[in-house]
Amino acid sequence: MKTIPTATESIAEFFSRYTGYLTTGDIEGLASAYNYPSLAVTALGCLAITDPQQSRDFFTQGQDFYRSCGIQGVRARDITTDIEVPGIWLGRLVLENLDDNGAPAGLERNAYQVVTAEDGTRRIAVSTPLDAYPQP
């Protein structure tokens, strides 16, 4: 039986690293923050992400879009752990978008399932945007 790896970073440290990659536009860093395969889940369907190039393409396009909207950075807020067991974290958080001056420029709520890789780093296995739907 395989041993469950121990995380080398807290979930707050992981999301700090992840939002750092988003802020600096570090496409390779972003691709490395995901498990392969991983899953993007929305009410419109599920997308299996089986190759890091899919992540690179997605985040390159996303960087162009966010920069064109004046968003220059992002930070994680309100990290909520719904459950954590060895090797798996399940929870949600708010990504706060920042303008050129570091002022808040919008919020995006997301849910994640994060796994611990064999080397102890955390990686996103499932991501779900929670604000991509009309509110009732």
List the predicted regions and their residue ranges.
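A short hydrophobic beta-strand element
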Residues: 73, 85-95
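Short beta-strand segments enriched in hydrophobic/aromatic residues
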Residues: 34-35, 95-97, 128-130
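Hydrophobic/aromatic beta-strand elements that line small-molecule binding cavities or substrate pockets
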Residues: 76-81, 94-97, 109-116
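Short, cysteine-centered beta-strand-loop-beta hairpins and adjacent loop/turn segments enriched
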Residues: 97-105
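Short beta-strand edge/turn micro-motifs at domain boundaries
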Residues: 91, 104-136
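Short, low-complexity N-terminal intrinsically disordered segments enriched in polar/charged residues
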Residues: 1-36, 40-42, 136
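A solvent-exposed, acidic/Ser-Thr-rich amphipathic alpha-helical stretch
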Residues: 27-79
